[in-house]
Swiss-Prot record:
Role noted for this protein: Protects DNA from oxidative damage by sequestering intracellular Fe(2+) ion and storing it in the form of Fe(3+) oxyhydroxide mineral. One hydrogen peroxide oxidizes two Fe(2+) ions, which prevents hydroxyl radical production by the Fenton reaction. Both oligomeric forms of dps exhibit ferroxidase activity and DNA binding. Dodecameric dps is capable of Fe(2+) oxidation/mineralization. Only dimeric dps affords efficient DNA protection against hydroxyl radical-mediated cleavage.
Binding site for Fe cation 1: H83, D110, E114
EC number(s) on file: 1.16.-.-
Name by which UniProt lists this protein: DNA protection during starvation protein 1
Swiss-Prot/TrEMBL catalytic activity: 2 Fe(2+) + H2O2 + 2 H(+) = 2 Fe(3+) + 2 H2O
Pfam families in the record: Ferritin (PF00210)
Organism whose genome encodes this protein: Deinococcus radiodurans (strain ATCC 13939 / DSM 20539 / JCM 16871 / CCUG 27074 / LMG 4051 / NBRC 15346 / NCIMB 9279 / VKM B-1422 / R1)
Any GO CC annotation of this UniProt entry: cytoplasm
UniProt biased composition (Basic and acidic residues): 1-12
Length: 207
């Protein structure tokens, strides 16, 4: 009769096989390890490669995807905050416009995160990660004034649009035309929203 393995023996075999005992990502809650590492010693990650990218190319592309993911989430939150904060004669116009702009950029959040996963990475989106990677800052204070809001958003959108164009070129040079093409599309959307807000800001009644 074959002797059944004990739990301790099973655990020993698990350790020898390299499969972690601490969950699918192999990290303990609150531990020092980060779930963003593409090469954690887990069964799942052992099956993941960077598709057609070399390691250096992947690092370049992954860096842009993580930064742009954090930036887009922050931009979404900023539009929402200003949507709630706005007061005055332009309340209804901007209150509704901000939600329309959010609807245009929101899909790119999931698209960028899933693109990173498809290439063998793991997106970070905790509050601390947003603060670390995002190029857009969400104000902690209440901002009621329409011109202050719009001018701030125009400045952010100008920077984000340029970032997408720069990152598109970087990804193209890193042998990833797919991500580069994604960024070109996002840049066009950001440019359109910036143009619309700039047109609103040019209205003298905004003061």
């Amino acid at each position: 009769m074959t002797k059944k393995s004990t739990k301790s023996e099973a655990a020993s075999k698990t350790k020898k096989s390299g499969v972690p005992e601490t969950g699918a990502q192999g990290v303990r809650a609150g531990g020092a390890d980060h779930a963003d590492a593409a090469h954690l010693g887990t069964v799942n990650n052992a099956l993941v490669n960077h598709h057609y990218l070399e390691e250096k190319e992947f690092q370049t592309v992954a860096e842009t995807l993580q930064r742009n993911l954090a930036t887009t989430i922050s931009l979404y939150l900023k539009f929402k905050k200003y949507h709630w904060d706005i007061r005055g004669r332009f309340f209804r116009d901007l209150h509704l416009a901000y939600d329309e702009f959010i609807a245009e950029i929101f899909p790119s959040i999931d698209e960028q995160a899933e693109r990173l996963v498809a290439l063998g990475g793991s997106p970070l989106a905790a509050p601390a990660d947003l603060a670390r990677y995002s190029t857009v800052q969400v104000p902690q204070e209440t901002v009621r004034d329409a011109r202050t809001q719009v001018a701030d958003l125009v400045q952010d959108l100008s920077r984000v649009g340029k970032g997408y164009r720069d990152d598109s070129q970087a990804c193209d040079e890193a042998n990833d035309p797919v991500t580069a093409d994604m960024y070109n599309g996002y840049a066009a959307t950001i440019d359109k929203i910036r143009w619309m807000l700039q047109a609103i800001m040019d209205d003298e009644r905004l003061d």
